[in-house]
Amino acid sequence: MAKRRAAEPLTFRVPWKRLLLSDFPEEPPLWVPPSGAARPLKRQGDAGTMAEPASAPRKRRGGGDDEPELQGRGLEPGEPPPGEQGEPQVSRAAGGGDRVESAGSPQGADEVHSQHNEDFWQYNTFQYWRNPLPPIDLAALEDVSANSLTETLEDKNEGVEIDMES
């Protein structure tokens, strides 16, 4: 069994990420492998390569300067990353009044964020993933005349009366 590289993504992209990228004319690749020059696949016969910091094995657990790597971890599938959720903060203005500010974003960006958040939950609804219903031809329903409708109702009433008499 082949070993999976740690740099490969575990899951495919979720639909809400596609919404954010829909403004671009061409879609970016799903995964770009790291450059091969930084880390060779096999060890070289050179003893000098072991002393280089680039060839040193990376730690899987523990502290370090790898904060961007750890940002996306710990999320459920389909959950937006926490960095994009601007929670409002209350701050005192110089005039003494309270005002609500978003975390590092202008008011227009909050509206855009809420729009993306709504779209994210729209993709997770049961109705979105169901197969679409075939189109209904309303002209077939309009062809029914009022006379045929009343005749049908009268026929049903006669059947009910007969059933009740017996």
From Swiss-Prot:
<dbReference type="InterPro" id="IPR033461">
    <property type="entry name" value="WRNPLPNID"/>
</dbReference>
<feature type="region of interest" description="Disordered">
    <location>
        <begin position="25"/>
        <end position="116"/>
    </location>
</feature>
<feature type="modified residue" description="Phosphoserine">
    <location>
        <position position="105"/>
    </location>
</feature>
<protein>
    <recommendedName>
        <fullName>Uncharacterized protein C9orf40 homolog</fullName>
    </recommendedName>
</protein>
<dbReference type="Pfam" id="PF15017">
    <property type="entry name" value="WRNPLPNID"/>
</dbReference>
<keyword id="KW-0597">Phosphoprotein</keyword>
<dbReference type="InterPro" id="IPR042349">
    <property type="entry name" value="C9orf40-like"/>
</dbReference>
